[in-house]
A protein has these predicted regions:
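Autoprocessing Asn-cyclization modules and mimics
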Residues: 54-58, 62-63, 67, 99-104, ...
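Glycine-enriched, solvent-exposed interface loops adjoining structured elements
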Residues: 1-122, 189-255
Length: 255
């Protein structure tokens, strides 16, 4: 049976010759019992902080890219990312194969490629749109050219005029061999001239990542990373640390 927050806590309590807890009174612990609960989490935290790449903390992230978006965030639980594992998932509908991205130093990105960030205008749809409407209602048209091309999801559209501060009119749907689709409110609308299938990934100073070139379609991206697990809270919560190391946790909690 897998070790739980309750069973680990009771092993510490037993070493101290105190009254053990049950699932019914676990949240009502008092005094030394609370100290034992806290000690379990402190021991687990200590173990997880000692090494970056414990195999039991390995995870794979899946990110759907957004056309015209350069920077993306790593999962909130991330401790360290393996930047050699970034890859695009093959998608025949989008026209991309399975591609492994090459890591690119942040300073090199700033020196050679950062200008891509200045080539993109973005806004969002302010209401849902069917697959046939010819006017896009957006949050703002500031920065958009008087006529041009926009990317919404995997659909490319052209428009003939900026109708107002919140509308693009004369829209032609499904250009560049894309497919007309319905789009929900809040979906990004982007305008740019370049972009493509990403080839490089750059770790930013805030431990997120940048893609170059920025994507022009909703490609699927995957990468491997290692997590820093959250503290145990409920009596039935389990740790990522294998049960065979339960004694190490208990030893740490009673040290």
């Amino acid at each position: 049976m897998a070790e739980t927050y309750l069973t680990l806590t009771n092993k510490v309590i037993a070493r101290l010759n105190e009254v053990e807890l049950t699932s019914a009174n676990f949240t009502s612990a008092r005094g030394i019992q609370v100290q034992c609960q806290n000690a379990i989490n402190e021991a687990i935290r200590y173990i997880n902080q000692r090494e970056y790449n414990y195999p039991f903390n390995h995870a794979t992230a899946a990110q759907t890219l957004t056309a015209g978006t350069v920077k993306y965030s790593v999962p909130a639980s991330t401790k360290v990312v393996d930047y050699n594992t970034f890859r695009l998932v093959k998608d025949s509908d989008l026209g991309n194969g399975s591609v492994t991205l090459s890591p690119l130093n942040y300073n090199e990105y700033l020196k050679s490629y950062v200008e891509q960030e200045d080539e993109i205008e973005t806004t969002t749809l302010s209401q849902s749109h069917t697959d046939s409407v010819t006017t896009l209602t957006v949050a703002s048209t500031t920065g958009f050219s008087s006529t041009g091309t926009v990317y919404v999801g995997n659909e490319v559209m052209t428009y003939t005029a900026v109708g107002s501060s919140t509308t693009l009119t004369g829209v032609t749907r499904a250009v560049s061999s894309t497919t007309a689709a319905a789009h929900a409110s809040g979906v990004q609308v982007a305008q740019f001239d370049d972009g493509g299938i990403p080839k490089y990934v750059t770790r930013t100073l805030d431990n997120n990542y940048i893609l170059y070139p920025f994507p022009t379609k909703s490609y699927s991206l995957k990468f491997d990373y290692f997590t820093f697990p959250a503290d145990l809270a409920a009596h039935g919560d389990t740790t990522t640390i294998p049960d065979r190391f339960a004694a190490v946790i208990v030893d740490g909690a009673t040290a």
